[in-house]
């Protein structure tokens, strides 16, 4: 317990990971695969090599000759946009060891690379502060808590399912950050601790990563890169969605009920002590529980429409961070008009809200710095190459389980699901053919490994999520460890079954 309490904060952990990654660039041989991509004018393929780039005909024969098992139309329709690794093309490079100056530059470069996410988070903070000042959020939460008394468990069941479904279907990830200021007060008012909303929101979306059945950023891109249809293995992934979500809901509900019965049983209380999230969540249990007034209903309607608009825009209109940020900025201005806020008061509240999430924004940027160091040191492909050589001659059942473990390892270095797919799938896909493992099994191993490791990797959304509820890494790891062991056993059994039967 004493050791757990000594775990440093999120930013210190990330800087330590950056230092370790820089050290690895001196120990692991540098190297890379040739990368194939369609030219900007869509007239030919462009292959990047150690000595430059080569133009090749934009034909299926070109892909076949390079042993890239991807139909040509996946490139011409831009289903695959990022450069794809060419199997068998790995070559050594001179060492690109990253020194002290590179370590100091890494978080700055990471912030540059993630400025769209950072601005999204800051604008969310401003929006939530303006809305919170209206008092409608507190009154709405008090009203909902009163209406749900005795049925709080259903909040966990329904919301975990919804977040898991959103992650599995269209890849909800960064968008879920907006729900913490809304749901944390609701779960605290129900008598739970800070781990419960964290497990529901972050855990739910991460379950969606693990069991993605139609996520365009992982399942579809990975299937395309592996040369199989994303619909192959769809029934199995839907089954995994049901099983993994059911196990997680049972685990969260069991913990929540224990904490509600005895607050001292809270892992947050035992590890972190009495902590509170970085924003005001105070509600009044003794407040009148009559119907909401029309002003509050109107403000809550604007609030709900903003979130529904975001979800609808992502699913149906292809929105991403620019459009979502614009939506929340516009909603903030609309609230200012409805609340008749003076210009100075609005700006002060908006800036105050953004300041409250500034540490979260920095964590996102610094986390990207890990990838910057590995890429600048030219060892990301080397890790993939030596890992592929290691598992290449294993029997199918052992091969898929080792792939699961390897993808867990890769998640530490490659936080982007689509980036990992186009870098690894052509290489792993070629290996899978040699050991007679079907393509959908390697896609599932990729999803399972990335999903499980995403619960605890410091380079993903774990640390920003922890910062939003002010829970330590030690408390989260202690809470999530038993669940991850169950999910790992489930995923391993499913993969073995898929190649044996």
Residue ranges and their predicted role:
Residues 2-11, 32-47, 235-349, 469, ...:
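Long, contiguous bundles of hydrophobic transmembrane helices that form the permeation core
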Residues 2-13, 180-271, 290-297, 460-494:
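Membrane-core helix-loop-helix motifs of multi-pass transport proteins
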Residues 8, 391-501:
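C-terminal transmembrane helix pair
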Residues 10-19, 47-138, 319-382:
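Core transmembrane alpha-helical segments of multi-pass membrane transporters/permeases
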Residues 13-27, 121-129, 162-166, 208, ...:
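Hydrophobic core segments of alpha-helical transmembrane domains in multi-pass membrane transport
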Residues 112-118, 146-158, 190-196, 354-362, ...:
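Membrane-interfacial loop-to-helix junctions in multi-pass transporters
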Residues 121, 152-167, 192-207, 233, ...:
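Alpha-helical transmembrane segments of multi-pass membrane proteins
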Residues 122, 151-182, 364-374, 390-430:
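Hydrophobic alpha-helical transmembrane segments of multi-pass integral membrane proteins
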């Amino acid at each position: 317990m004493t050791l757990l309490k000594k775990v440093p904060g999120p930013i210190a952990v990330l800087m330590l990971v950056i230092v370790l990654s820089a050290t690895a660039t001196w120990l692991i041989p540098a190297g890379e695969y040739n990368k194939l991509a369609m030219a900007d004018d869509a007239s030919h393929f462009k292959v990047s090599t150690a000595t430059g780039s080569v133009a090749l005909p934009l034909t299926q024969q070109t892909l076949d000759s390079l042993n890239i098992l991807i139909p040509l139309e996946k490139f011409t329709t831009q289903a695959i946009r990022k450069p794809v690794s060419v199997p068998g093309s790995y070559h050594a490079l001179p060492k690109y060891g990253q020194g002290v100056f590179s370590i100091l530059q890494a978080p700055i470069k990471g912030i540059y690379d993630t400025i769209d996410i950072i601005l999204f988070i800051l604008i969310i903070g401003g929006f939530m502060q303006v809305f919170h000042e209206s008092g409608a959020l507190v009154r709405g939460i008090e009203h909902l808590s009163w209406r749900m008394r005795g049925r709080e468990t259903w909040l966990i069941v329904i919301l975990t399912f919804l977040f898991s479904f959103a992650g599995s279907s269209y890849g909800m990830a960064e968008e879920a950050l907006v729900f913490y200021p809304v749901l944390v007060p609701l779960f605290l008012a129900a008598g739970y601790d800070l781990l419960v909303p964290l497990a529901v929101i972050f855990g739910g979306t991460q379950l969606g990563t693990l069991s993605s059945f139609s996520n365009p950023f992982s399942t579809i891109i990975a299937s395309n890169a592996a040369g199989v249809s994303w619909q192959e293995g769809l029934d199995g992934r839907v089954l995994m969605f049901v099983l993994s979500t059911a196990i997680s809901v049972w685990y969260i509900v069991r913990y929540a009920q224990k904490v509600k019965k005895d607050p001292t049983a809270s892992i947050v209380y035992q590890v972190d002590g009495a902590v509170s999230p970085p924003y005001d969540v105070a509600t009044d249990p003794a407040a009148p529980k009559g119907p909401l007034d029309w002003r509050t209903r109107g403000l809550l309607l604007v609030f709900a429409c903003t979130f529904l608009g975001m979800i609808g825009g992502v699913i149906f209109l292809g929105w991403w961070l620019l459009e979502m940020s614009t939506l929340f900025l516009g909603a903030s201005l609309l609230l200012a008009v409805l609340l008749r806020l003076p210009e100075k008061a609005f700006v002060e509240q908006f800036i105050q809200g953004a300041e409250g999430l500034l540490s979260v924004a920095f964590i996102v940027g610094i986390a990207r710095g890990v990838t910057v160091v590995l890429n600048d040191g030219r060892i990301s492909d080397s890790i993939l190459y030596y890992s592929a050589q290691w598992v290449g001659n294993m029997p199918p059942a052992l091969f898929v389980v080792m792939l699961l473990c390897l993808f867990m390892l890769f998640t530490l270095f490659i936080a982007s699901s689509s980036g990992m797919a186009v870098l690894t799938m052509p290489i792993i896909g070629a290996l899978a053919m040699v050991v007679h493992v079907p393509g959908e099994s390697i896609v599932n191993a990729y999803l399972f490994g990335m999903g499980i490791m995403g619960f605890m990797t410091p380079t993903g959304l774990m640390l920003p999520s922890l910062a939003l509820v002010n829970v330590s890494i030690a408390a989260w790891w202690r809470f999530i460890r038993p669940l991850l062991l169950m999910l790992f056993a489930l995923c391993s059994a499913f993969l073995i079954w898929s190649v044996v039967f």
